[in-house]
Design a protein with these regions (language model features):
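Extreme N-terminal basic, low-complexity initiation segments
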Residues: 2-6
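The catalytic Nudix box helix
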Residues: 56-91, 145
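Short, charged/polar surface micro-motifs in flexible loops or helix N-caps
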Residues: 32-34, 44-47, 63, 98-99, ...
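Active-site-adjacent beta-strand/loop module that shapes the phosphate/pyrophosphate-binding cleft
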Residues: 93-130, 142, 164
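N-terminal strand-loop-strand
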Residues: 17-56, 105
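Short, positively charged and aromatic/hydrophobic N-terminal segments
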Residues: 9, 13-14
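Alpha-helix-centered segments that form part of catalytic cores
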Residues: 131-146
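Charged phosphate-binding loop/patch that engages nucleotide di/tri-phosphates or the phosphate backbone
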Residues: 147-175
Length: 175
């Protein structure tokens, strides 16, 4: 009953029509004692030569009536081809520069960043006179130390990395 009430409240907030909301997963692992996070690079010609400050957690918009965690899991799978399992730790939502609110969950896991299989989108390229072309939503992925990830990730998502470190520190898994 309480869970239904919370879900209904979240849905009212998400679909009030004023702010866009997306949901994603912050996948993490430990390699030789170093905390690493999994980030994706947006596909398409606009992002092709951009690197620092454009990477993201795998995420996407929440469909009407969809549970935000279910949306996060769906989006991760659509953008990477992988479906992480484990304990999903809800993080405090962050607001990106665009105004979009990102709901995120941290989950420990592993996947081969070189083996991602992303969904695609269609775009007229070049704009105004080019032809319709298909591009991957995500063109590459990588595992990064938290310090390196702070350089790579969108400014508005950097707070998710700090939250992950705090959660893991509280569990005695990170210094």
């Amino acid at each position: 009953m309480v869970e239904e009430s919370i879900h209904s409240s979240i849905e009212v907030i998400i679909f009030a029509g004023m702010t866009k909301h997306s949901a994603g997963l912050l996948l993490y692992r430990f390699r030789e004692g170093v905390l690493e996070v999994f980030l994706v690079h947006p596909g398409g010609p606009f992002w092709e030569k951009k690197d620092l400050g454009v990477w993201s957690i795998p995420k996407g918009e929440i469909d009407k009536g969809e549970d935000p965690l279910d949306a996060a899991r769906r989006e991760f799978e659509e953008e990477t081809g992988f479906r992480p399992e484990g304990i999903f730790r809800e993080l405090t939502p962050v607001r990106q520069r665009s105004g979009k609110i990102v709901h995120a969950w941290a989950v420990e896991g592993d996947c081969d960043a070189a083996a991602i299989q992303s969904n695609t989108f269609t775009l007229q390229w070049p704009p105004h006179w080019g032809s319709q072309q298909e591009f991957p939503e995500v063109d590459r992925a990588g595992w990064f130390s938290v310090d390196r990830a702070k350089e790579k990730i969108l400014d508005g998502q950097r707070g998710l990395l700090a939250q992950l470190e705090l959660v893991l520190r509280g569990e005695g898994k990170h210094q």
